[in-house]
Amino acid sequence: MAKPWRIVDRADTAEGLLDLRQRGATDFLITIDGRVLMNSSATMSEIVLAQLACEPLKNKKNVSVLVGGLGMGFTLKAAIDNLPADAEIVVAELNPIIVKWCRGPLAHFSDRAVDDPRVKIVIDDVAALIHYAATKGKGHRFDAIIIDLYDGPHAGAPGRGGYLYGNQAVASGRSALKAGGVFAVWSEDPDKVFENRLKAAGFSVNRQRPGRGGRRHVVYIARKTSASKMNA
């Protein structure tokens, strides 16, 4: 019989009860109101997302990367592993308790990535940081923006979907990037509307589904290229 999940820690958030659950010695879940946000045994798409976004930056200088969503730290760890020693990595995370978990019971998954000297944790909405960079322009832009949030860009995403993945949000993401910068987005499933939105905003788009068989999530690697075709 499988061991039951136990609640390790819990916080009340605007979106509901945020739980860290553990089963046995190695299995962890992060859930919100019972919905699984992260599973420590299903991390391939998050890792590939960061690898594809950051590998082209390995030999560049003064690299700046924004990561939206900390989760269990797998995405951040993959970014660190593929960036130069002088890179700056800004992580936007809404819930301080997630940072606490990544320094505590989840620290071994990412080799304590949150404490890497290249990393700056900001307790804020990633959309606010993107808007700031887009507004301020040169000197504030990123080489890559990695969005690894549990909702993703699908049409049914509650609440935050539009302002993170809508026309204006995608245009803002493009403005927040340096020339040739990458806008990398995790998605639960393929979303042709979102893919077309990226292309219309002036991105070349590479869609991948890491893994083989079973449920495979989607990563969009969108590179800033031509001028936007959008009106908004």
Model-derived segments and spans:
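Rossmann-like AdoMet
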Residues: 1-61, 81
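Active-site beta-strand termini and strand-to-loop segments that position acidic
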Residues: 22-23, 222-225
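Residue-level signal for short segments within beta-strands and strand-turn junctions
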Residues: 32, 140, 223-224
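Loop/helix-junction capping segments adjacent to catalytic residues or to phosphate/diphosphate-binding pockets
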Residues: 39, 73, 192
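The AdoMet/dcAdoMet-binding core of the Class I SAM-like
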Residues: 43, 47-177, 185-186, 201, ...
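Glycine-centered, phosphate/nucleic-acid-interacting loop/turn motifs that mediate DNA/RNA or nucleotide
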Residues: 181
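Short alpha-helix
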Residues: 189-201
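Flexible, glycine-/basic-rich loop-and-beta segments that form/coincide
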Residues: 225-232
